[in-house]
Amino acid sequence: MTERAGLRLHDTAAGAVRDFVPLREGHVSIYLCGATVQGLPHIGHVRSGVAFDILRRWLMARGFDVAFIRNVTDIDDKILNKAAAAERPWWEWAATYERAFTAAYDALDVLPPSAEPRATGHVTQMVELIERLIERGHAYAGGGDVYFDVLSYPDYGQLSGHKVDDVHQGEGVATGKRDQRDFTLWKGAKPGEPSWPTPWGRGRPGWHLECSAMARTYLGAQFDIHCGGMDLIFPHHENEIAQSRAAGDGFARYWLHNGWVTMGGEKMSKSLGNVLAIPTMLQRVRPAELRYYLGSAHYRSILEFSDIALQDAVNAYVGVEEFLHRVRSRVGAVVVGDWTPRFAAALDDDLSVPIALAEIHHIRAEGNRALDAGDHDAALQSASSIRALMGILGCDPLDERWESRDETSAALAAVDVLVQAELENRQKAREERNWALADEIRNRLKNAGIEVTDTADGPQWLLGGDGK
């Protein structure tokens, strides 16, 4: 099958499913809003990575060349505040958690992006974008900051459906703003914060500006698809559109948004304290099982986390895995086959993964019946098809990469038991004000390549790679 098979995607801007037609035949350009690296990645973060990794894999299977950009926001109020509270340099804090996100994506076999730009590496492009906006009458300097004039852009609110009169940027009152509906492009320097020189004085970029500048740098003035979580529709993506198009760029042609992961009906977020960190989850289930779970619901739906739902996904994945192992042990090697028309139709219909999974489990049932009846050819054909389908979803159980990840996950679980014991000893030493012993334990862990960060939720550890 070819790229002209009729892929349709739900475009948030249109509020409907649309035929996908790329700007350039055979090529697709995608920008995914990546992490603000302020803390450990949780399953809400990584669901976005998995959802749009499936999109990328399907496009590649269809024969497209895919340019996939995922940024890193490494300068932000939350990063600065948390680093200051921990008495650590902001750049060290950001780098620590950037590595944690990379490790989480790698563990779940999310394909590496074509490029992964950091915000701090693209300040020059951000300043150039601001200059264009000021020249066109869409931005102004005030009080040391630079703001986007929302009323200067008549189409503001079309993505989110917000009426201009009802806009609240959530930035608080700023003395330099002409209108409180305007949003910040550039923040004037504050004592103790990182800053860069500009024509308007030293400062640092606003969050919305970062993505517009990086998307343009790597994908050009117009590109195919912009992805992100549904919580980014407003104000982040609305503001990206406004500043990019006001500067004369076509920007994204399709907008795709994935649903939240919730617990008890509430969005999973650090501020609510209801997060499930990826390292914690990988002590409970294997990486492939977690990926299967996060990708199993339709990407636009809310994924309500529960232990029962997680176990159901694990059981479903194990059922597929056991079938493939049965075929391999009885018949022989199982090569990757072709995808089926029903599977292709499901993914072409706005990435309907639940229907695609139903096809996989239907084939598995047929394959098990064939194997029990001694029809090895039919069983092998079923197994080969399943490998192809599960591979497009990124969780083929017979892929050798998963076997190595399973071993790594088991090793990390064993290390965690040992590290937690050391952290308990360190906490006891701190309670007894035995600072020398507490420092000795921390240094011992550091020499083993384990970074310990004290947070409001207790100490967290990461493999830092700096062991002697």
UniProtKB/Swiss-Prot annotation:
Motif 'KMSKS' region: where in chain: 267-271
Native species: Mycobacterium ulcerans (strain Agy99)
Protein's cellular compartments: Cytoplasm
Protein name: Cysteine--tRNA ligase
UniProt catalytic activity: tRNA(Cys) + L-cysteine + ATP = L-cysteinyl-tRNA(Cys) + AMP + diphosphate
Keywords: Aminoacyl-tRNA synthetase, ATP-binding, Cytoplasm, Ligase, Metal-binding, Nucleotide-binding, Protein biosynthesis, Zinc
Cofactor binding annotation: Binds 1 zinc ion per subunit.
GO molecular function list: ATP binding; cysteine-tRNA ligase activity; zinc ion binding
Broad EC category: ligase
One Pfam family in the UniProt entry: DALR_2
HAMAP family from the UniProt entry: Cys_tRNA_synth (MF_00041)
Family, similarity comment: Belongs to the class-I aminoacyl-tRNA synthetase family.
EC number: 6.1.1.16
SMART domains membership: DALR_2
Annotated positions binding Zn(2+): C33, C211, H236, E240
Biological-process GO terms, alphabetical: cysteinyl-tRNA aminoacylation
Origin: domain of life: Bacteria
Sequence positions that bind ATP: K270
Complexes and interactors: Monomer.
Motif ('HIGH' region): 35-45
Main localization category: cytoplasm
CDD domains named among the record's database cross-references: CysRS_core (cd00672)
Protein's UniProt keywords contain Membrane: no
